[in-house]
Amino acid sequence: MSFRGGGRGGGDRGGRGGFSSRGGRGGFGGGGRGGYANAGPPETVQPMGSFMHAVEGEMLCQSTDAKHVPYFNAPIYLENKSQIGKVDEILGPINEVFFTVKMDPGMVATSFKADDKVYISGDKLLPIERFLPKPKSLTKAPKKKGGARGGAAGGRGGFGGGRGAPRGRGGFGGGRGGARGGGFGAPRGGGRGAFGGGRGGAFSGGRGGAAGARGGFGGRGRGRGGY
């Protein structure tokens, strides 16, 4: 399995995070495809991977850092801080990461030997935890007390009685709102969040919650839809 960045720009590319096929752009991406400004070599570099073989003029490397994933377009160096290229693709499962290095002008991938080490600046790494599934919360939201009005709504929803009762219509609208917010918003947010990282989960979950709220207070509109 392979994945590319949704964008190749500088900065934190983990916003949309996840794995996708090579053709897709749903990887660790975010932003545009622009590169990093060339500010010279960093003060320190750390091992990022070892060279395996050349592929279509690029270096294929296996990550040796089990705790981090490199940014797309992050500069790659030798131990002496000489830049040789930039990260182009990230491949493989989360527990066995590979990456390719697009060579800088004058650099040739076939000039390297198997197991040659490549290095990266520490500020161009993302923690691997960012791309792992989030555990589901064990805490449950407190149930709201229904009261008499809630009872009327439940009666109508379950058996279809009391069609003309105002309380029945209000309750039915609230029910629709709850279903939309909890049923569609939460799974959609959870699904996207698990696969796509924090942004998907937060945005979709938030929208689902908002839909639920609107349904709850929009009894009139939802009630008419039911008819």
Curated annotation (Swiss-Prot):
It is found in: Nucleus, Nucleolus. One of its GO terms (biological process) is snRNA pseudouridine synthesis. It comes from the Eukaryota. Residues 1-48, 136-227 are annotated as: Disordered. Residues 16-37, 148-227 have a biased composition (Gly residues). Coiled coil: none annotated. Residues 149-226 are annotated as: RGG-box 2. One of its GO terms (molecular function) is box H/ACA snoRNA binding. Residues 4-35 are annotated as: RGG-box 1. GO terms for cellular component: box H/ACA snoRNP complex. Keywords: Nucleus, Repeat, Ribonucleoprotein, Ribosome biogenesis, RNA-binding, rRNA processing. InterPro entries: Gar1/Naf1_Cbf5-bd_sf, H/ACA_rnp_Gar1/Naf1, Transl_B-barrel_sf. Gene3D superfamilies: Probable tRNA pseudouridine synthase domain. Non-catalytic component of the H/ACA small nucleolar ribonucleoprotein (H/ACA snoRNP), which catalyzes pseudouridylation of rRNA and is required for ribosome biogenesis. This involves the isomerization of uridine such that the ribose is subsequently attached to C5, instead of the normal N1. Pseudouridine ('psi') residues may serve to stabilize the conformation of rRNAs. The H/ACA snoRNP complex also mediates pseudouridylation of other types of RNAs. The H/ACA snoRNP complex mediates pseudouridylation at position 93 in U2 snRNA. PANTHER family: H_ACA RIBONUCLEOPROTEIN COMPLEX SUBUNIT 1, NUCLEOLAR PROTEIN FAMILY A MEMBER 1 SNORNP PROTEIN GAR1. Belongs to the GAR1 family. Component of the small nucleolar ribonucleoprotein particles containing H/ACA-type snoRNAs (H/ACA snoRNPs). This is H/ACA ribonucleoprotein complex subunit GAR1. The lineage of its organism: Eukaryota, Fungi, Dikarya, Basidiomycota, Ustilaginomycotina.
